[in-house]
UniProtKB/Swiss-Prot annotation:
Residue span(s) of domain PNPLA: 32-229
Family, as annotated: Belongs to the patatin family.
Gene designation: pat2-k3
Motif, GXSXG: chain positions: 75-79
A GO molecular function held by the record: nutrient reservoir activity
Residue ranges of coiled coil: 321-384
Record-given protein name: Patatin-2-Kuras 3
Keywords: Coiled coil, Glycoprotein, Hydrolase, Lipid degradation, Lipid metabolism, Plant defense, Signal, Storage protein, Vacuole
GO cellular component term of the entry, any: vacuole
Signal peptide range: 1-23
Amino acid sequence: MATTKSVLVLFFMILATTSSTCATLGEMVTVLSIDGGGIKGIIPATILEFLEGQLQEVDNNKDARLADYFDVIGGTSTGGLLTAMITTPNENNRPFAAAKDIVPFYFEHGPHIFNSSGSIFGPMYDGKYFLQVLQEKLGETRVHQALTEVAISSFDIKTNKPVIFTKSNLAKSPELDAKMYDICYSTAAAPTYFPPHYFVTHTSNGDKYEFNLVDGAVATVGDPALLSLSVATKLAQVDPKFASIKSLNYKQMLLLSLGTGTNSEFDKTYTAEEAAKWGPLRWILAIQQMTNAASSYMTDYYLSTVFQARHSQNNYLRVQENALTGTTTEMDDASEANMELLVQVGEKLLKKPVSKDSPETYEEALKRFAKLLSDRKKLRANKASY
């Protein structure tokens, strides 16, 4: 929780100098953030498939990809996996996975990743298949090769510090130019579920640099939206592409934050009487659930408040299902029946209103975002041609 607070303080310190000068659409910094949640990544994957389809329709281009429209794509845990899939280049320097390929990936590999390969004295899953499939899909690609700026979090249990993998930090910290498959496994290595991940890179002097990493949710508590915005803010200050942005304000931000769902109000909640009888192990399991839920709500609360205060509420969209029940609440239930339910959750979510105070549905809001993203991309391209 202290790490989340530090990121929040850093973010608001950077933005404290923002001007009120309204920028043109072409100068917007566009950010996509994807939560962690294991197999529940199927929910944001379903949303991304819809959004990419809308971008293809708006631009009349079946080859349009999300990485073409977002300046920063950030994720933690399963969100980090999605980030890598849509930003890692293939042999043609295009994203190796379209958004429509992500859900089939979960269906094909989820049951093997979340199998019963662990032991009673260790993590529930040994992670061997997971790492193998990541190596096969992502190859030797490193951070610097990502097709847009990325922000993938993990936590080093040896240094007791968060590790943020971004392209913009490589000049200062070349040891962060790790292989994408190492990063993806690390950000998803949730304690008790998968073993921590050890790998080595090299510093600018050629010295070995060791990583001992676990799930990025330990660093960002599941929702990387603040982290992604902090990276975007820093990027806008150093990237020549954003030279015309003198001082970033909220009218120059477009943030899409995708959740993996939270439990319904009375599902998996507890009373003080129940909790009074718990031992340490029971508390560990409950605290993880409570912390993730609290972080998701509070991060959205912070961002909604700030964007609204700056009269830029239409520039921020949080897509989240808050009424998961039954098996859909589990991050490791990769049965075909449950994965089908998660797809349905994502599809039904598109038809729901963004808030109780707004008649706009998530589907309508995403169509609006697709138009904004398309317009911004075209304006920036036109500006570059002069």
